[in-house]
């Protein structure tokens, strides 16, 4: 495993208000080693692409803008310097998208088929797809290896977790001019600020009621600002597409 000091020195950060492709949890704390069994890390020797979520033994869900060349997929990872015996590494066999990967305002989703199945273990297990969409006010969990400070970056050696809520979508519409009411996204965070996903967390999960309800997508350039919640891909709207792709119907149509 590459040492965190080396990894941090090689990160290529692409900062814009509409991208969290290298972001971490602001206002959180170290995740319990047993609570992020589905969390994966996407990176190569020179760049942190973001996170993702294992949804079955062969498939990972992430954000489209986290895609990159020579990307490796790490599972069962907690401490960069102390990889545990359960750690497994995979690469993408196939990738599926719902839109032009250059834009992340909407349809920011990537479905990855692994080159070989993973083995479930103490620190590796899939997360369920949503059976229904989350309601406003729902308590949710965010997690990732992104920066824990903003605007200056501080990358941790372990993933951080925090609790946030599903907010009215109109709050994000007011905060971001590019976001439309019809976008297939969720608005989530803490209205007063202080807790947020940030650079390095993109592609990671928004977990509500034990299911992956959102994918970390984008937000303000400075993470954790009041009235500037995060925007998350709404996974429920893509469940039919995801299941069709997994079943072998690779021509499945994305929701419009």
Swiss-Prot record:
It is found in: Secreted. The active site is at 65 (charge relay system), 108 (charge relay system), 202 (charge relay system). The keyword Transmembrane helix does not apply. Keywords: Blood coagulation cascade activating toxin, Disulfide bond, Glycoprotein, Hemostasis impairing toxin, Hydrolase, Platelet aggregation activating toxin, Protease, Secreted, Serine protease, Signal, Toxin, Zymogen. One of its GO terms (cellular component) is extracellular region. Expressed by the venom gland. Residues 19-24 form a propeptide. Its EC number is 3.4.21.-. Glycans are attached at residues 44, 119-120, 152. CDD domains: Tryp_SPc (cd00190). Its platelets aggregating activity is inhibited by chlorpromazine, theophylline mepacrine. Its platelet aggregating activity and its amidolytic activity are inhibited by PMSF, TPCK, TLCK and soybean trypsin inhibitors. Is unaffected by hirudin or by antithrombin-III in the presence of heparin. Residues 25-247 form the Peptidase S1 domain. The keyword Iron does not apply. Residues 1-18 form the signal peptide. Pfam families: Trypsin. Disulfide bonds join 31-161, 98-254, 140-208, 172-187, 198-223. Its main location: secreted. Thrombin-like snake venom serine protease which potently induces platelet aggregation and has fibrinogenolytic activities. Clots purified fibrinogen and hydrolyzes alpha-chains (FGA). High concentrations of this enzyme also cleave prothrombin (F2) and factor X (F10). Is also able to activate factor XIII (F8). Monomer. Belongs to the peptidase S1 family. Snake venom subfamily. This is Thrombin-like enzyme cerastocytin. It comes from Cerastes cerastes (Horned desert viper).
